[in-house]
Amino acid sequence: MRKGIWGFALVAIVLLMASCSSESEYANAIPKDAAMVMSFDFKTMAEKSGINGKGGEKVVAKLTDALKSGLEGEAYKTAEKIIQNPSESGLSFTDKVYMFITPHSNAFALLAKVDDEGKVEALLEALKNEQICTELKSESGCTWTQMGTALCAFNKGTFLLMGSNKGDALSLKGSLLSLMRQDAENSYVKTTDFGKLASAKGEVVTVMNMSFIPNDITMQMRMGMPADLKLEDIKYLVSATFEKGKIVVDVETLIENKDLIAMYEKQSAASSCIKGACLEYFPANTLVWAGGN
């Protein structure tokens, strides 16, 4: 388990240290029925955080030291090399990085573009030697391996890391390989939701519908809602922008169901904007506050 965590940690570090790349078709691997899709602009996030400048040198040093306690031998040398030069990972993170969740949260995945297939393979071979992932296998035009409770696959353009809420990684193999060879016509990229995701401003942008909620919770949500309502009809676009000292979050409803729109309008008519009359009673050091009227 601890070995698997270091595999995920290395990917996370590379995300914030990434370098330039060009467009590709890797987003075709997002399933058309994805319940939640998030896009991450790690290039802008890294620029705003200052991690690539002089101020980020201490952070990089701490990340390198942290890896020393979790990786050894060739895996550590590879990780250290990637931190110094992220392109050595073979992955590109100035193209958008995506995370998606399937309906009822049955599976979740991280998707990135591959710049150099050979370097990705070398990275995973180093992790395999540390028993962080299993033997690499070639099948259906890609290479795949198991990393803890997740499966990882890559080819010359796509890197896909996929896990299940049931913890049975191998049960995802069929879906993983199918998504790796999926074309645009059968992908999320051909939906109007993807167009809104791609055009929205923000370092982290999410399009989601309520079908991502597990089955055992959805029954409670349906109370008081139209009988013919589909959870897929309840959709939101959420964008987060990182500014100095704050994170600005914008939420937009993408609901098209007329009955549901009427219900929301009725609820909105019974509420009003918060005037802030009670703010003076909050302590000056309040970390989070919320209110409704």
Language model region names:
Residues K166-G174, Q220-V238:
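Extended, charge-rich low-complexity interaction segments
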Residues C20-Q146, E185-L231, I247-N293:
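Structural boundary/hinge residues at secondary-structure and domain interfaces
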Residues W144-S178:
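A short, solvent-exposed beta-edge/loop patch
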Residues F8-M17:
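Bacterial N-terminal signal peptides
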Residues M99, L151-K156, A227-G245:
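Broad, structure-driven detector of short, well-ordered beta-strand segments within folded domains
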Residues M1-A9:
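Bacterial N-terminal signal peptides that target proteins for export
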Residues A9, M147, S239-E243, G292:
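Enriched - but not universal
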